Amino acid sequence: MYVLVRKKGNKMKKLVKLIIVLVLVMVSGCTTQKKEENARIIDTSMFLYKVSNQEGKYSYLFGTFHPGRYPIKSLDKVTEKALDESDSIYLECDMKPSPKETEEITKYNTYNSIRDLGLEDKYENLMKQYKSLKGKPGYALYNVFVINSLINSDPEVLNKANISKFSAIDNYIYEYAQKKKNFKEVEGIEFQMKLLTELSGDYSETILDNLANKEMVIKSAKEDLDAYYSGNTQYYEDEQNLLLNQLEQLNDSDKEKYEKYWDILAYNRNIHMKDTLADSIHNNKHDFIGVGCKHLYGKKGIIQLLKDDGYLVECMK
């Protein structure tokens, strides 16, 4: 697939990069939160939206981000107020599953393993590049998404992209919800693991090829996090629309392959997330629904889907 990318030129290369970035962001989540010195107030109000129906009933939609950057003292007053007044606080999945749940989901780590797919040579190339994989040939027994998670914890990636695995926004929200005892899942970890397993058979080689471009991995992670912490929502809007526009320009066979990937990983989930929020409003609840910010934006993002259904979507910044 790497040769295919080079032959097809910049459009295909950019498209694959954008699609792979979706995976990198999605499966690098579930970090931990701990007390750190120099904690600061993080303004996330530009990613907070009040969603209302024609009767004025509303819930909140929030775009979160899995990797963190700065120690968190609190979020801005607007977001904190929305959290405080919400009946339930939703995130994509439980950050601290029970031992039984953990045992259930770990079985997915070996489905479509690198070894089973005959891709050990590509994994060996990654071992040479990333300290988190160095000297660990046994990790070929896992699938590509486990390897991706390990790469997202690689010391060089964390350092150069300015990532802190202890300061994630969604973990702050999760702990807030645990104190209020009102946490709910939008999807659940097992759902996400099944989804990734479904993708891993057909797309592992492509993902491994892109992970081999360490410079791109670091650059993409840094750009995404820079955009979030600077409140640049237009970055995500442009990125998602560029991806969709480039999908339309592919030949039929490539278009079918990558549209399937996009639908499974993003669009179908966007619809489910939109429906979760709509159900909240319909049931007269004031809920706070936080999902990865990339799900919110673009022509097929949650915000546009809600507008298409007649909801008023207002940024709280």
State what each model feature region is.
Residues 36-39, 48-257, 261:
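Structured, acidic catalytic/metal-binding patches in enzyme active sites
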Residues 41, 72, 266-270:
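A conditional alpha-helix N-cap/helix-loop micro-motif detector
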Residues 13-21:
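Sec-dependent signal peptide recognition
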Residues 31-33:
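Bacterial signal peptide processing site
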